């Protein structure tokens, strides 16, 4: 299924040219930032971007929460739980974020890796038990809704592993991304999620967005699909946009 909001944004950009600007959102992170979900304090070791070798940091891993506002180029409906409950995970270990901080983000509809979507699909499979995607009660955004801080920590670590591990392996104990000092429950959830990679369906590209900022941690969150309208409707939209451009050119 295609995502209509991305389609119409693309059509508008192609048709209107310079009239189109990047989609943005302002996020105020909760204080504490793990409000309602909790976290696990762990050690992570990763490649040093500025020199040879690696860096090791002691960090809190878990799902972030905040409030969104000042939308430009997107509608509030693209955020699964609304702007007052904006759930997300860190997608950038080389920057930082603080409790209560305000950050202006660019909404990126193609900022995540396929490997990340594979992991999140595995998370959904575990979190939904034996339910299928069409079953009543199935949560397609279960990865955004951890029930405990240990679940959230395991999801966050898997997201980092999906992005920063240079090999195809899924092993937090070795490689270019390493995590240690996990609580036992975090390890249990990580192993459960890892065990479903490859046997569960990856998330579709349209189901995930990233929030990007060059100076602060990028975030990753969910993006609910919107059905594409009938071809006749799309043709009318394209024609209207083309007419808008033509009118502006005549005025110029």
Annotated model-derived regions:
Residues 2-25, 217-245:
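Short, threonine-centered small-residue motifs that mark membrane-proximal processing/anchoring sites
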Residues 24-225:
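Short, surface-exposed polybasic-aromatic patches that bind anionic ligands, especially phosphate groups
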Residues 245-252:
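C-terminal membrane-anchoring or membrane-association module
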């Amino acid at each position: 299924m295609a995502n209509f909001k991305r389609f119409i944004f693309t059509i508008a950009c192609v048709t209107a040219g310079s009239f189109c600007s990047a989609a943005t959102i302002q996020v105020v992170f909760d204080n504490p930032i793990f409000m309602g979900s909790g976290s696990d304090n762990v050690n992570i070791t990763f490649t040093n971007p500025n020199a040879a070798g690696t860096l090791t940091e002691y960090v809190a891993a878990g799902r972030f929460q905040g409030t969104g506002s000042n939308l430009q180029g997107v509608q509030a409906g693209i955020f699964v739980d609304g702007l007052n409950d904006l759930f997300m995970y860190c997608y950038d270990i080389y920057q930082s974020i603080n409790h209560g901080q305000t950050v202006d983000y660019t909404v990126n509809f193609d900022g995540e890796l396929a490997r990340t979507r594979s992991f999140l699909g595995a998370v959904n499979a575990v979190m939904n038990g034996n339910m299928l995607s069409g079953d009543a009660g199935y949560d397609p955004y279960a990865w955004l809704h951890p029930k405990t801080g240990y679940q959230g920590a395991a999801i966050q670590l898997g997201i980092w592993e999906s992005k920063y591990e240079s090999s195809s392996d899924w092993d937090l104990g070795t490689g270019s991304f390493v995590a240690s000092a996990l609580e036992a429950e975090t390890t249990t959830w990580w192993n459960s999620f890892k065990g479903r990679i490859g046997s569960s369906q990856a998330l579709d590209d349209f189901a995930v967005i990233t929030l990007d900022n060059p100076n602060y941690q990028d975030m990753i969150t969910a993006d609910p699909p919107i059905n594409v309208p009938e071809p006749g409707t799309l043709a009318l939209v394209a024609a209207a946009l083309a007419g808008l451009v033509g009118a502006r050119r005549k005025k110029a």
